[in-house]
Amino acid sequence: MRQFVIIGHDAPTTPEFSLDDLAGAAGRLDVLCRCVTSAFFLSHAIREDVRVHLILGDEYTVTFEGSDLRRLNPDERSTAALIRKALEEREEAIGHIPVETSPGVSLTRRGFEGTLDDVARRGTVVQLHEDGDPIVGVAPPSDPVFVLSDHHDFRDEEAALLADRADERVSLGPKALHADHSITVAHNYLDTAGFERY
Protein backbone atom coordinates (compact mmCIF):
# COMPACT_ATOMS: atom_id res chain seq x y z
CA MET A 1 0.00 0.00 0.00
CA ARG A 2 1.26 3.44 -0.94
CA GLN A 3 0.00 6.35 1.09
CA PHE A 4 0.31 10.09 0.65
CA VAL A 5 -0.39 12.64 3.37
CA ILE A 6 -0.76 16.18 2.03
CA ILE A 7 -1.10 19.12 4.39
CA GLY A 8 -3.48 21.81 3.13
CA HIS A 9 -2.62 24.84 5.25
CA ASP A 10 -5.20 27.17 3.70
CA ALA A 11 -7.72 24.50 2.69
CA PRO A 12 -11.37 25.11 3.56
CA THR A 13 -12.89 23.37 6.56
CA THR A 14 -16.49 24.11 5.60
CA PRO A 15 -18.32 23.32 2.34
CA GLU A 16 -18.98 27.00 1.62
CA PHE A 17 -16.51 27.43 -1.22
CA SER A 18 -16.99 27.90 -4.92
CA LEU A 19 -15.98 25.20 -7.35
CA ASP A 20 -15.24 28.05 -9.75
CA ASP A 21 -12.47 29.59 -7.60
CA LEU A 22 -10.39 26.70 -6.27
CA ALA A 23 -7.12 28.61 -6.57
CA GLY A 24 -8.42 31.69 -4.75
CA ALA A 25 -11.29 31.77 -2.31
CA ALA A 26 -11.03 28.01 -1.71
CA GLY A 27 -7.56 28.36 -0.18
CA ARG A 28 -5.56 26.76 -3.01
CA LEU A 29 -7.73 23.67 -2.95
CA ASP A 30 -6.62 23.25 -6.56
CA VAL A 31 -3.21 22.09 -5.29
CA LEU A 32 -4.77 19.34 -3.18
CA CYS A 33 -7.06 18.27 -6.03
CA ARG A 34 -4.10 17.90 -8.38
CA CYS A 35 -2.35 15.81 -5.71
CA VAL A 36 -5.33 13.45 -5.57
CA THR A 37 -5.42 12.95 -9.34
CA SER A 38 -1.63 12.50 -9.52
CA ALA A 39 -1.79 9.87 -6.79
CA PHE A 40 -4.49 7.75 -8.43
CA PHE A 41 -4.60 8.15 -12.19
CA LEU A 42 -2.71 6.08 -14.71
CA SER A 43 -3.27 6.44 -18.44
CA HIS A 44 -6.32 4.15 -18.51
CA ALA A 45 -6.76 3.03 -14.91
CA ILE A 46 -6.75 3.99 -11.25
CA ARG A 47 -4.09 2.84 -8.82
CA GLU A 48 -6.03 0.70 -6.37
CA ASP A 49 -3.09 0.22 -3.99
CA VAL A 50 -3.03 3.91 -3.01
CA ARG A 51 -4.54 5.86 -0.13
CA VAL A 52 -4.45 9.67 0.06
CA HIS A 53 -5.04 11.71 3.21
CA LEU A 54 -5.75 15.43 2.77
CA ILE A 55 -5.26 17.43 5.96
CA LEU A 56 -7.69 20.36 5.80
CA GLY A 57 -6.64 23.23 8.03
CA ASP A 58 -5.32 20.80 10.68
CA GLU A 59 -8.94 20.15 11.61
CA TYR A 60 -10.24 17.42 9.29
CA THR A 61 -8.71 14.64 7.22
CA VAL A 62 -10.37 13.55 3.99
CA THR A 63 -9.15 10.10 2.92
CA PHE A 64 -9.40 8.65 -0.59
CA GLU A 65 -9.13 4.84 -0.79
CA GLY A 66 -8.06 3.62 -4.24
CA SER A 67 -9.58 0.15 -3.93
CA ASP A 68 -13.07 1.55 -3.24
CA LEU A 69 -12.93 4.85 -5.10
CA ARG A 70 -15.77 5.76 -7.45
CA ARG A 71 -16.75 8.99 -9.20
CA LEU A 72 -13.21 10.36 -9.30
CA ASN A 73 -12.46 12.10 -12.57
CA PRO A 74 -9.13 13.58 -13.66
CA ASP A 75 -10.22 17.20 -13.24
CA GLU A 76 -9.85 19.52 -10.25
CA ARG A 77 -13.50 20.53 -10.12
CA SER A 78 -14.95 17.03 -9.68
CA THR A 79 -12.30 16.19 -7.06
CA ALA A 80 -13.16 19.41 -5.21
CA ALA A 81 -16.84 18.40 -5.36
CA LEU A 82 -15.96 15.13 -3.55
CA ILE A 83 -14.10 17.13 -0.89
CA ARG A 84 -17.02 19.54 -0.53
CA LYS A 85 -19.42 16.60 -0.16
CA ALA A 86 -17.18 15.21 2.59
CA LEU A 87 -17.22 18.56 4.39
CA GLU A 88 -21.01 18.72 4.10
CA GLU A 89 -21.14 15.59 6.26
CA ARG A 90 -18.47 16.66 8.76
CA GLU A 91 -20.97 16.80 11.64
CA GLU A 92 -21.53 13.04 11.20
CA ALA A 93 -17.88 12.28 12.00
CA ILE A 94 -17.49 11.50 15.69
CA GLY A 95 -13.99 11.81 17.09
CA HIS A 96 -11.60 9.74 15.02
CA ILE A 97 -14.40 7.54 13.67
CA PRO A 98 -14.66 8.27 9.94
CA VAL A 99 -17.83 8.98 8.03
CA GLU A 100 -17.91 7.61 4.47
CA THR A 101 -19.20 10.40 2.28
CA SER A 102 -19.06 8.66 -1.09
CA PRO A 103 -17.54 5.36 -2.26
CA GLY A 104 -13.86 5.43 -1.31
CA VAL A 105 -14.00 8.86 0.35
CA SER A 106 -14.23 9.42 4.10
CA LEU A 107 -13.76 12.24 6.59
CA THR A 108 -12.42 12.18 10.15
CA ARG A 109 -12.17 14.92 12.77
CA ARG A 110 -8.43 14.67 13.01
CA GLY A 111 -5.57 16.95 12.06
CA PHE A 112 -2.00 16.28 11.04
CA GLU A 113 -0.65 14.79 14.27
CA GLY A 114 -3.48 12.27 14.67
CA THR A 115 -3.30 11.24 11.03
CA LEU A 116 0.49 10.93 11.13
CA ASP A 117 0.34 8.77 14.26
CA ASP A 118 -2.23 6.51 12.59
CA VAL A 119 -0.36 6.00 9.31
CA ALA A 120 3.02 5.59 11.03
CA ARG A 121 1.74 2.41 12.69
CA ARG A 122 1.21 0.79 9.29
CA GLY A 123 3.99 2.08 7.09
CA THR A 124 7.36 3.72 6.64
CA VAL A 125 6.98 7.50 6.96
CA VAL A 126 8.97 9.36 4.29
CA GLN A 127 9.01 13.15 4.41
CA LEU A 128 9.39 14.69 0.96
CA HIS A 129 11.44 17.86 1.30
CA GLU A 130 13.77 19.71 -1.04
CA ASP A 131 16.50 19.67 1.65
CA GLY A 132 16.27 15.91 2.26
CA ASP A 133 18.72 13.18 1.28
CA PRO A 134 18.64 12.23 -2.42
CA ILE A 135 15.99 9.56 -2.92
CA VAL A 136 18.29 7.50 -5.15
CA GLY A 137 20.31 6.60 -2.04
CA VAL A 138 17.26 5.24 -0.19
CA ALA A 139 15.91 1.73 -0.72
CA PRO A 140 12.22 1.80 -1.69
CA PRO A 141 10.12 0.88 1.36
CA SER A 142 7.41 -1.75 0.94
CA ASP A 143 4.62 0.31 2.56
CA PRO A 144 5.66 3.95 2.13
CA VAL A 145 3.76 6.86 3.61
CA PHE A 146 4.94 9.99 1.78
CA VAL A 147 4.27 13.23 3.66
CA LEU A 148 4.34 16.52 1.81
CA SER A 149 3.07 20.03 2.12
CA ASP A 150 0.95 22.09 -0.24
CA HIS A 151 2.42 25.30 -1.71
CA HIS A 152 3.69 26.33 1.76
CA ASP A 153 6.66 24.95 3.66
CA PHE A 154 6.02 22.74 6.66
CA ARG A 155 5.24 24.83 9.74
CA ASP A 156 7.64 24.56 12.68
CA GLU A 157 5.34 22.26 14.67
CA GLU A 158 4.81 20.01 11.61
CA ALA A 159 8.56 19.86 10.97
CA ALA A 160 9.13 18.92 14.62
CA LEU A 161 6.57 16.10 14.41
CA LEU A 162 8.17 14.81 11.23
CA ALA A 163 11.67 15.03 12.70
CA ASP A 164 10.42 12.77 15.49
CA ARG A 165 8.29 10.33 13.47
CA ALA A 166 9.65 10.18 9.91
CA ASP A 167 11.83 7.21 9.04
CA GLU A 168 13.37 9.07 6.09
CA ARG A 169 13.59 12.66 4.82
CA VAL A 170 14.23 12.63 1.10
CA SER A 171 14.53 14.97 -1.83
CA LEU A 172 13.26 14.00 -5.27
CA GLY A 173 15.80 16.08 -7.16
CA PRO A 174 17.91 19.23 -7.24
CA LYS A 175 14.95 21.52 -7.96
CA ALA A 176 11.84 22.15 -5.84
CA LEU A 177 8.77 20.51 -7.40
CA HIS A 178 5.06 21.16 -7.10
CA ALA A 179 3.34 18.79 -4.68
CA ASP A 180 1.42 16.94 -7.42
CA HIS A 181 4.58 16.52 -9.50
CA SER A 182 6.38 15.14 -6.44
CA ILE A 183 3.72 12.44 -6.15
CA THR A 184 4.25 11.46 -9.79
CA VAL A 185 8.02 11.21 -9.29
CA ALA A 186 7.55 9.19 -6.07
CA HIS A 187 5.29 6.76 -7.94
CA ASN A 188 7.88 6.42 -10.70
CA TYR A 189 10.56 5.76 -8.10
CA LEU A 190 8.48 2.91 -6.64
CA ASP A 191 7.26 1.59 -10.00
CA THR A 192 10.86 1.22 -11.17
CA ALA A 193 12.26 -0.22 -7.90
CA GLY A 194 14.29 2.88 -7.16
CA PHE A 195 14.87 3.85 -10.81
CA GLU A 196 16.50 0.45 -11.44
CA ARG A 197 13.89 -1.49 -13.43
CA TYR A 198 12.14 -0.18 -16.55
Curated annotation (Swiss-Prot):
One of its GO terms (molecular function) is tRNA methyltransferase activity. Gene3D superfamilies: 3.40.1280.10. One of its GO terms (cellular component) is cytoplasm. InterPro entries: Alpha/beta_knot_MTases, TrmY, tRNA_m1G_MTases_N. It is found in: Cytoplasm. One of its GO terms (biological process) is tRNA methylation. It comes from the Archaea. Its EC number is 2.1.1.257. It is an enzyme of class 2 (transferase). SUPFAM superfamilies: alpha/beta knot. It catalyses: pseudouridine(54) in tRNA + S-adenosyl-L-methionine = N(1)-methylpseudouridine(54) in tRNA + S-adenosyl-L-homocysteine + H(+). Its main location: cytoplasm. Specifically catalyzes the N1-methylation of pseudouridine at position 54 (Psi54) in tRNAs. NCBIfam families: PRK02135.1. This is tRNA (pseudouridine(54)-N(1))-methyltransferase.
